[in-house]
Amino acid sequence: MSAKPQPIAAANWKCNGTTASIEKLVQVFNEHTISHDVQCVVAPTFVHIPLVQAKLRNPKYVISAENAIAKSGAFTGEVSMPILKDIGVHWVILGHSERRTYYGETDEIVAQKVSEACKQGFMVIACIGETLQQREANQTAKVVLSQTSAIAAKLTKDAWNQVVLAYEPVWAIGTGKVATPEQAQEVHLLLRKWVSENIGTDVAAKLRILYGGSVNAANAATLYAKPDINGFLVGGASLKPEFRDIIDATR
């Protein structure tokens, strides 16, 4: 197999953090010497982005938003892509299962957002994944490929340079259940094959596919050893110093 593309270790803080806890954690990140080629991403709440921008000094990191809408205007409570760009944020997580589950974001809505973000120059971490019911009904492939094809339908081939896929089995998020490295690799390989056949072998070779779902310091290295796992989208463990060990696991 050809060499893996540059890995990504992404911290999705979700709706968590206080000024004090974030300052403490960012200090830990700043003091962490990372000696290999890896893109670290941290996604704080919108409110905490300026704090992290002011305090984070580790050059391996970029700051991401956890969500965004396409345009500014009369959308109370939302934050738009132009506003994020204006404050210097150029990465965004879109389609996280919590957005899909709690806020009714359909495959179509997520695909439209990913397309808009690419057009506006963002790097996008686009999330896909199946529920426990879907996995038990043997629908994993059908679900993740329909989510991926919805996104692909709205993207030019060039736009894939700005897209990172994150496979997050919904049944493994925050539950302590983790897909086995074999289960995760099976889905990652399926996704890469689909991209290879439908978008291009060149795109598939460069595409970073992250795993998300109860990733921690204990399981990260075993997961990363699989050929089609290119890093992680980390929830709970990214709020702890343990995130350093997950970054180190992507060597």
UniProtKB/Swiss-Prot annotation:
Coiled coil location: none
Keyword Isomerase: yes
Keyword field: Cytoplasm, Gluconeogenesis, Glycolysis, Glycosome, Isomerase, Peroxisome
InterPro entries: Aldolase_TIM, TIM_sf, TrioseP_Isoase_bac/euk, Triosephosphate_isomerase, Triosephosphate_isomerase_AS
An example Gene Ontology biological process: glycerol catabolic process
Pathway this chain belongs to: Carbohydrate biosynthesis; gluconeogenesis; Carbohydrate degradation; glycolysis; D-glyceraldehyde 3-phosphate from glycerone phosphate: step 1/1
GO cellular component terms, semicolon-separated: cytosol; glycosome
Species name: Leishmania mexicana
Record field: transmembrane: none
GO molecular function, one term: triose-phosphate isomerase activity
EC number: 5.3.1.1
Subunit structure and binding partners: Homodimer.
Superkingdom of the organism of origin: Eukaryota
Subcellular location, record wording: Cytoplasm; Glycosome
Protein's name in the database: Triosephosphate isomerase
Catalytic activity: D-glyceraldehyde 3-phosphate = dihydroxyacetone phosphate
